C-alpha cells in the first residue's frame, strides 16, 4: 500500500487525525497546539515510527547483505517512504510553540523530531540524493583491484591483508594506488552533486550547510574551538610517536623512501588509510628480544571462529551484570563473509531494527586480534541498543555520536589488558617487566595515538567543502594538504585533482560523519578511568580490567539506559564528575610510554614534525585546457575540435567535387570544335579573363592549396587531442616513489 494512504488509515484508526481536521476554520489554534496535544502527537509518532523505521531497516539490511538491483530498488522505495513519513511529522512538530511548555522532555522530543536530515528535501531532490548515495556506496563496495594476470582483489580481506602483512613497498604501492584509482575516480564526477544536495537538505532543516547540521548533534556552540583545543593537547603524543616510527621505518626501508625530517609515505604504515599502525609493530618494537606473544596465532591454534569471538564479547558484558545479546542476534547477524557468492557490504556496522530485541551486526570477521577488538566495539553498540530500547524511538541513539563510539571501545581497553588476555588463555607469561610494558603500550599507541589526527581531519576537511572554503577543483589537493598538516603523511606517488583519494575511505561515500570517532577516542579513556576507579582498581590505568565488575557494569548500564534523553554533558557529569570531554585520562594512560618516547627521540636527535616539507602533487589550479593558443573549458575545447574535424571533412568533400568538376570541364573544352574555341577565346578565374589552359592551371594550384590547408587542420586537431589525453608520468611507472 502507498505510504500516504497507509499513514492516513493509521491516523484515522488511532483517532489522531480528527483533531487536526477539526482545526480548519477555528479562530484559534492555541488549544490544538497545546502541550497536551503535543503529548498525543508524540504518542502517535511513537506508534507509527516503529513500523516505518523497521521496514526501512529490513530493506536496507537485505540490500547490504545481498547487493542486487531488486534489493536496491526495494531499499530506495522504503527510504522514500521513510523520508515522506519523517517530513510529515517534522513539519507538524514545527507548528508547536514550545516556549511556554513546562515539560522539558516534550520540548526536547519535539526539537529532535524537527531535524530530519535529508528527508527535508523536495521529492525530486530526495530521489536524486538517494540514488547518488546508493551509487557512491555501491561503487565502493564493488570496487576491485586486478592483477595483470590473475584474480581481482576486493578490499576485505584481500587488499587489507596485503597492507597489513606485506613488507614489499612495491606490492604495498600497487594495493594502495590500485584501491584509490578503482574507487576515487568513480566518485569524483558525482561528489559535487552530493555536496550541493547535502547543503540543500541542511538549509531545509534550518542550517547554513551540512557541516553545521552535523555539528548540531553535539549541542555545543563552541564545538570547533573545543575540538581544536583537544587536538592541541594530544598533539605532542602524536608527534613523538610519529618521529619514533619514522626512524624505525628508516632503518627498515632506508633513505630512498624515508626522510628523517619529512613526512612518512602513506602506504608503509600497515593500513589502507594509515589511520592505525598496529600492523607494523614488528618493525617498530622498542625491545625486539621481548616481543609480545602473537595473539592472532594463538587464536588460530585454539581454533577460534568468528562466532566464538562474538560469544567472548557477549560474555564480557554479562560478567559485568549487563544484558546478553538476544537469540535473534545470533540467528540474523552476518558475522563473516558469506561463502555463497553473494555480493555484500563488508564494512563493519551494528543495526537497530526498532523492534523488540532485534539487533544485528554486519561484519566480514577474520580471526585476528584486531578483529577481536572490533567485535567488542560492535557488541558495545548492541549493548547500547539493548539498554535504551524501552525509550521513545526519538531517544534511541547515544547521548551524542561520540558516546556511541566510546562504549564498545571502553570495554576493548579492558580486553587489551595483560590481565584479561592472560585470564582468557591468550597469553602465557604471567607478568610484564618494564621493557615488556613499553612494548605493550606502544602496541596500543599504534592504534589509539596514531588515530588522533586522522579522526580529527576527515570531518574538518568535509566541513570546509560544505561551507565552500574548498572548491571542487582542489578536492584532492586539499585532502593531502590536511593529511600532511595533521598526520605528517604524503602519497607515495604524485596525485592530481583527477583523483579523489578521500573517496577511498568508506565514510566519505557512505555519508557518515567522522568527528564522533575523534571525540569517542578521547571519551573512552575518560569513561574507562571512571569505571576503574569505581571498581576499586589500584595501579596504572593501562593495567585495569573491568571483567566481572558488577559496580562498573551498573554505572555503564545506567548511562546507556538514558539514550539521548538528556544532554550529553549531564550524562558525562554523572559518570565522571566532569561536564566536558577531557584528555587527562588519555594522557595518564600513555604517560609511561610518552616518557620513554621523549627520552628515545632526544637520544636519537630526532626532529618532531616535518618542517618545510610538502607533498609532491600534480597541481591543476584550473580545469581549463589550451585550444588554439587560448585557455578554455574542456567541454568547449572538445566541441571546437569536433567543429574543426567537421570543417575539414566538408572541405575534403568540396575539394573533391571541385576537382571532378574541373576535370570534366577541361576534358569537354579539349573535345569541342576549334571554331567554337575561337568564338570563346577566354575563360575566367576569380573574375579575370584568361586563356583556358591558364585558368585550368590556376584552378589546380588552388585545389592543391586547399588540400595543404586541410592536412594542416587535421594535423593540428591530432596534436590537440594527443596533448589533452597524454598519460601522467606516475601512471606509466608503478614503481616510482
Swiss-Prot record:
GO terms for biological process: proteolysis. Glycans are attached at residue 390. It is found in: Cytoplasmic vesicle, Secretory vesicle, Acrosome membrane. The chain crosses the membrane at residues 640-660, 701-721. Residues 24-639, 722-737 are extracellular. Zn(2+) binds at residues 377, 381, 405. It holds the Pfam family Peptidase_M2. Disruption phenotype: No visible phenotype. Sperm have normal fertilizing ability. GO terms for cellular component: acrosomal membrane; acrosomal vesicle. It is a multi-pass membrane protein. Its main location: membrane. Chloride 2 binds at residues 218, 516. Disulfide bonds join 146-152, 346-364, 532-544. Residues 1-23 form the signal peptide. Keywords: Cytoplasmic vesicle, Disulfide bond, Glycoprotein, Membrane, Metal-binding, Signal, Transmembrane, Transmembrane helix, Zinc. GO terms for molecular function: metal ion binding; metallopeptidase activity; peptidyl-dipeptidase activity. Expressed in sperm and testis (at protein level). Expressed in heart and testis. Not detected in kidney, lung, liver, brain, ovary, spleen and thymus. Interacts with IZUMO1. Belongs to the peptidase M2 family. This is Angiotensin-converting enzyme-like protein Ace3. It comes from Mus musculus. The gene is Ace3.
Amino acid at each position: 500500500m502507498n505510504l500516504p494512504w497507509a499513514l492516513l488509515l493509521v491516523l484515522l484508526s488511532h483517532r489522531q487525525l480528527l483533531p487536526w481536521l477539526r482545526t480548519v476554520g477555528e479562530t484559534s489554534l492555541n488549544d490544538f497546539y497545546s502541550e497536551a496535544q503535543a503529548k498525543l502527537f508524540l504518542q502517535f509518532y511513537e506508534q507509527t515510527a516503529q513500523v516505518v523505521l523497521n521496514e526501512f531497516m529490513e530493506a536496507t539490511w537485505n540490500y547490504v547483505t545481498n547487493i542486487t538491483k531488486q534489493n536496491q530498488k526495494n531499499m530506495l522505495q522504503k527510504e522514500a517512504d521513510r523520508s515522506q513519513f519523517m517530513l510529515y511529522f517534522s513539519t507538524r512538530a514545527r507548528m508547536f510553540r514550545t516556549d511556554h511548555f513546562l515539560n522539558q522532555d516534550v520540548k526536547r522530543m519535539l526539537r529532535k523530531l524537527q531535524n530530519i536530515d535529508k528527508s527535508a528535501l523536495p521529492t525530486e531532490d530526495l530521489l536524486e540524493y538517494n540514488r547518488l548515495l546508493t551509487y557512491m556506496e555501491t561503487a565502493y563496495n564493488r570496487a576491485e583491484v586486478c592483477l595483470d594476470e590473475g584474480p581481482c582483489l576486493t578490499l576485505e580481506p584481500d587488499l587489507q591483508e596485503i597492507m597489513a602483512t606485506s613488507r614489499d613497498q612495491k606490492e604495498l604501492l600497487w594495493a594502495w594506488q590500485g584501491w584509490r584509482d578503482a574507487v576515487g575516480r568513480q566518485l569524483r564526477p558525482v561528489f559535487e552533486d552530493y555536496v550541493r544536495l547535502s547543503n540543500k537538505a541542511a538549509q531545509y532543516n534550518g542550517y547554513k550547510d551540512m557541516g553545521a547540521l552535523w555539528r548540531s548533534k553535539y549541542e555545543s556552540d563552541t564545538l570547533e574551538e573545543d575540538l581544536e583545543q583537544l587536538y592541541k593537547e594530544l598533539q605532542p603524543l602524536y608527534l613523538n610517536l610519529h618521529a619514533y616510527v619514522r626512524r624505525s621505518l628508516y632503518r627498515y626501508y632506508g633513505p630512498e623512501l624515508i626522510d628523517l625530517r619529512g613526512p612518512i609515505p602513506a602506504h608503509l604504515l600497515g593500513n589502507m588509510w594509515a589511520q592505525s599502525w598496529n600492523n607494523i609493530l614488528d618493525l617498530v618494537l622498542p625491545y625486539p628480544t621481548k616481543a609480545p606473544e602473537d595473539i592472532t596465532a594463538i587464536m588460530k591454534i585454539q581454533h577460534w571462529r568468528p562466532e566464538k569471538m562474538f560469544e567472548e564479547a557477549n560474555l564480557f558484558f554479562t560478567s559485568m551484570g549487563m544484558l546478553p545479546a538476544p537469540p535473534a542476534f545470533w540467528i540474523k547477524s552476518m558475522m563473516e563473509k558469506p561463502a555463497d557468492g553473494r555480493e555484500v557490504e563488508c564494512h563493519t556496522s551494528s543495526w537497530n531494527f526498532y523492534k523488540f530485541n532485534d539487533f544485528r551486526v554486519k561484519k566480514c570477521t577474520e580471526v585476528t586480534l584486531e578483529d577481536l577488538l572490533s567485535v567488542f566495539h560492535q557488541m558495545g553498540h548492541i549493548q547500547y541498543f539493548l539498554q535504551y530500547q524501552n525509550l521513545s524511538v526519538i531517544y534511541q541513539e547515544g547521548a551524542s555520536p561520540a558516546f556511541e563510539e566510546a562504549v564498545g571501545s571502553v570495554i576493548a581497553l579492558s580486553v587489551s589488558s595483560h590481565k584479561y588476555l592472560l585470564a582468557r588463555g591468550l597469553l602465557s607469561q604471567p607478568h610484564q617487566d618494564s621493557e615488556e610494558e613499553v612494548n605493550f603500550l606502544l602496541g596500543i599507541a599504534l592504534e589509539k595515538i596514531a588515530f588522533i589526527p586522522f579522526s580529527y581531519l576527515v570531518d574538518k576537511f568535509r566541513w570546509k567543502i560544505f561551507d565552500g572554503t574548498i572548491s571542487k577543483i582542489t578536492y584532492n589537493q586539499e585532502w593531502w594538504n590536511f593529511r600532511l598538516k595533521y598526520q605528517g603523511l604524503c602519497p607515495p606517488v604524485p596525485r592530481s585533482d583527477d583523483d579523489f583519494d578521500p573517496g577511498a575511505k568508506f565514510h566519505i561515500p557512505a555519508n557518515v560523519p567522522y568527528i564522533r570517532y575523534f571525540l569517542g577516542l578521547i571519551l573512552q579513556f575518560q569513561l574507562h578511568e571512571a569505571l576503574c576507579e569505581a571498581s576499586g582498581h589500584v595501579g596504572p590505568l593501562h593495567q585495569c580490567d573491568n571483567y566481572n565488575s558488577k559496580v562498573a557494569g551498573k554505572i555503564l548500564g545506567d548511562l546507556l539506559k538514558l539514550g539521548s534523553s538528556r544532554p550529553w554533558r549531564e550524562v558525562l557529569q554523572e559518570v565522571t564528575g566532569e561536564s566536558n570531554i577531557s584528555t587527562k585520562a588519555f594522557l595518564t594512560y600513555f604517560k609511561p610510554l610518552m616518557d620513554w618516547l621523549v627520552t628515545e627521540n632526544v637520544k636519537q636527535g630526532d626532529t618532531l614534525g616535518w618542517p618545510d616539507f610538502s607533498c609532491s602533487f600534480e597541481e591543476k589550479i584550473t580545469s581549463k585546457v589550451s585550444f588554439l593558443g587560448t585557455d578554455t573549458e574542456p567541454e568547449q575545447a572538445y566541441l571546437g575540435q569536433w567543429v574543426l574535424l567537421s570543417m575539414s571533412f566538408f572541405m575534403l568533400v568540396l575539394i573533391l567535387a571541385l576537382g571532378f568538376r574541373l576535370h570534366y570541364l577541361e576534358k569537354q573544352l579539349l573535345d569541342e570544335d576549334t571554331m567554337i574555341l575561337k568564338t570563346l577565346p577566354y575563360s575566367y578565374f576569380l573574375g579575370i579573363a584568361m586563356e583556358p589552359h591558364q585558368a585550368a592551371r590556376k584552378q589546380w594550384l588552388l585545389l592543391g592549396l586547399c588540400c595543404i590547408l586541410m592536412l594542416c587542420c587535421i594535423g593540428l586537431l591530432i596534436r590537440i587531442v594527443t596533448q589533452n589525453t597524454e598519460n601522467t608520468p606516475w601512471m606509466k611507472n608503478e614503481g616510482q616513489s
